[in-house]
UniProtKB/Swiss-Prot annotation:
Intramembrane stretches (start-end): 130-141, 142-148
Species for this entry: Bos taurus (Bovine)
Residue spans crossing the bilayer: 81-105, 158-179
Protein name, entry field: G protein-activated inward rectifier potassium channel 1
Regulation: Heteromultimer composed of KCNJ3/GIRK1 and KCNJ5/GIRK4 is activated by phosphatidylinositol 4,5 biphosphate (PtdIns(4,5)P2).
Assembly information from the UniProt record: Associates with KCNJ5/GIRK4 or KCNJ6/GIRK2 or KCNJ9/GIRK3 to form a G-protein activated heteromultimer pore-forming unit. The resulting inward current is much larger.
């Protein structure tokens, strides 16, 4: 301990476990107890890494009778040891019951005592006791037919029992053998060859913060119509005060683009883009340390060899999501084929990733760009903006018809239109800025001083400006404007002169 202090100096602190076990208490040399660090409580998994749902049903009461109404599914869902026990027990009871029935018939007819009489015809030949009756039933049920024991035509009750035995044996065989076949052919073992990465990662992809994990198929047989879904399990409290311990939210992994439909021949990286619609819109690297959530991944598809639907599941808790990591590439191009290296399937490496959430990144982008017009946040502002646009349209429609025709002509100087539109756009952009920025923007630079002074002089005394001082191109434009003004009514000419003065 002293060697560590000499190496690291006074900054070294000893972290000891408190006696109560409720947290960690760091202490430094010559210092009293510091603030107690309470460790984050680990979330109980809803779905294990192997796909098993960690749920137990209790206090069913009378509802347990529903299991008997679907007896076949109940037997299939049982564990193998119980299936084998029921299989052996059912056949043993059925065999003993039918053997007892044949023995009862032989006993009631007196065949057990008269079987050795030469001229006596028993119901079943060569049945003297219960073991011989049991062997006769087994030979008949298994269709072995040794020929030593057989039923005669002098026993109608034996014929009826023989028919009942055949029907009952077929039912038992169909039920138990079918149950065992379905249990053996279940695609649960096929899910063992579908792999999920041990961790999920968050990093930038195509300029967007993205949650990613990897899936793979170890077999050469394909999964037909493979589809993947993701659920976010997180506890929350509603505004009404209701607590939801397992609130399920859908994570978009490409529903609109079809990216959720997988061609699972080689390992694929599943992506969830974190945007304003994502539940992780507010998630940052720092806030993830205090969050508690679970991402459940469900991969479904049809097994190519059997045609049965297979489902593989796994989950990722907040501790299994790595911020600023990316998966190591596993596919390489060899001579004539692609090779997949599954030894690097779970491997990740660090990449530069902003530690901020998408919401924080958007806010910082808005703060760093002051020229961006403020967003319309409520319906009142949106309504006022629409009214302003309608007012501009009304002003243009209230002009005299002659002016409307002149401005609507194709040969109207486009340069003037561009100049006017540029001026108006600049005025609108300056009007959207704060007052301090407007005053700064209104100060002309060295390169624009002459232009601004000349423009001010022209605007202050437009009537005294000589047309001859203008460039030739502007002289023609000014002459055209003078002719257009001469064609205006007297009232409009007076309005124009009042505006200039």
């Amino acid at each position: 301990m002293s060697a560590l202090r000499r190496k690291f100096g006074d900054d070294y602190q000893v972290v000891t476990t408190s006696s109560s076990g409720s947290g960690l208490q760091p202490q430094g040399p010559g210092q009293g107890p510091q603030q107690q660090l309470v460790p984050k409580k680990k979330r109980q998994r809803f779905v294990d890494k192997n796909g098993r749902c960690n749920v137990q049903h209790g206090n069913l009461g009378s509802e347990t009778s529903r299991y008997l109404s679907d007896l076949f599914t109940t037997l299939v869902d049982l564990k193998w040891r119980w299936n084998l026990f029921i299989f052996i027990l059912t056949y043993t009871v059925a065999w003993l019951f039918m053997a007892s029935m044949w023995w009862v018939i032989a006993y009631t007819r007196g065949d057990l005592n008269k079987a050795h009489v030469g001229n006596y015809t028993p119901c079943v030949a060569n049945v003297y006791n219960f073991p011989s009756a049991f062997l006769f039933f087994i030979e008949t049920e298994a269709t072995i037919g040794y020929g030593y024991r057989y039923i005669t035509d002098k026993c109608p009750e034996g014929i009826i029992l023989f028919l009942f035995q055949s029907i009952l044996g077929s039912i038992v065989d169909a039920f138990l053998i079918g149950c065992m076949f379905i249990k053996m052919s279940q695609p649960k073992k096929r899910a063992e060859t579908l792999m999920f990465s041990e961790h999920a990662v968050i990093s930038m992809r195509d300029g967007k913060l993205t949650l990613m994990f990897r899936v793979g198929n170890l077999r050469n047989s394909h999964m037909v119509s493979a589809q993947i879904r993701c659920k976010l399990l997180k506890s929350r409290q509603t505004p009404e005060g209701e607590f939801l311990p397992l609130d399920q939210l859908e994570l978009d992994v490409g529903f609109s683009t079809g990216a959720d439909q997988l061609f699972l021949v080689s390992p694929l990286t599943i992506c969830h883009v974190i945007d304003a619609k994502s539940p992780f819109y507010d998630l940052s690297q720092r806030s993830m340390q205090s969050e508690q959530f679970e991402i459940v991944v469900i991969l479904e598809g049809i097994v190519e060899t059997t045609g049965m639907t297979c489902q593989a599941r796994t989950s990722y808790t907040e501790d299994e999501v790595l911020w600023g990591h990316r998966f190591f590439p596993v596919i390489s191009l060899e001579e004539g084929f692609f090779k997949v290296d599954y030894s690097q399937f779970h491997a990740t490496f660090e990449v530069p990733t902003p530690p901020y959430s998408v919401k924080e990144q958007e806010e910082m982008l808005l703060m760093s760009s002051p020229l961006i017009a403020p967003a319309i946040t409520n319906s009142k502002e949106r309504h006022n903006s629409v009214e302003c646009l309608d007012g501009l349209d009304d002003i243009s429609t209230k002009l005299p018809s002659k002016l409307q025709k002149i401005t609507g002509r194709e040969d109207f100087p486009k340069k003037l239109l561009r100049m006017s539109s540029t001026t108006s756009e600049k005025a609108y952009s300056l009007g959207d800025l704060p007052m301090k920025l407007q005053r700064i923007s209104s100060v002309p630079g060295n390169s624009e001083e002459k232009l601004v002074s000349k423009t001010t002089k022209m605007l202050s005394d437009p009537m005294s400006q000589s047309v001859a001082d203008l460039p030739p191109k502007l002289q023609k434009m000014a002459g055209g404007a003078t002719r257009m003004e001469g064609n205006l009514p007297a009232k409009l000419r007076k309005m124009n002169s009042d505006r200039f003065t």
